């Protein structure tokens, strides 16, 4: 994301990076209650991210790498008659970070948490086109241990932020059942192959307004010299306009590929601004 005013004035510095993770989840309960489908389960995830951070003048200052492991639980509720749904997610994460710049390394561990409540109501525009208004509330926090490198000490403290997202999702709703292919026959496995045009595919766009508030978290640093301590208070409070778009295709009965890309534009405060993209591979068993 872009720099919004400079870190010395409390803004988040400009950065760019990438991440990858593996997630394994399983349903623990599936039932029907009062006309609703209820599903509850747990998941675990492990991932790695690498982020390049820039100074106020645009020069590269260093790289932050994070190895993270997460455990979480989810609850999904669907009203069978109307299609109204709600997702509740709670997650805890353990972080192991390394910051590197100018032959100076800094290592720190920490803990993060996240809670999310999301709801939506789908409306059929045509037989295979769905418009779904959505509303989501997210509360997340991070606590990092204090650390020290060759330049001095750093005290991170505790940080947290809350987000409200309001928008809608417009997309196709084709049957994702992996039917009988006609393009050729896989004689080794005795199953039909599928050409690209035969694959079940859904596409969607999702414009949203995201409001970030109650963003807090101070960071102080200094040396053994008296009076050298400085405190920074990066803020993400503000409003962003966000646009996401994606495609998903079922390439096997239990295998789905997806791609997603988006852009967020800050319209007030120090909210996030920048591009994002991701590719996913979803396997069920």
Give each language-model segment a name:
Residues 1-285:
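Membrane translocator/pore-forming domains, dominated by Gram-negative outer-membrane beta-barrels
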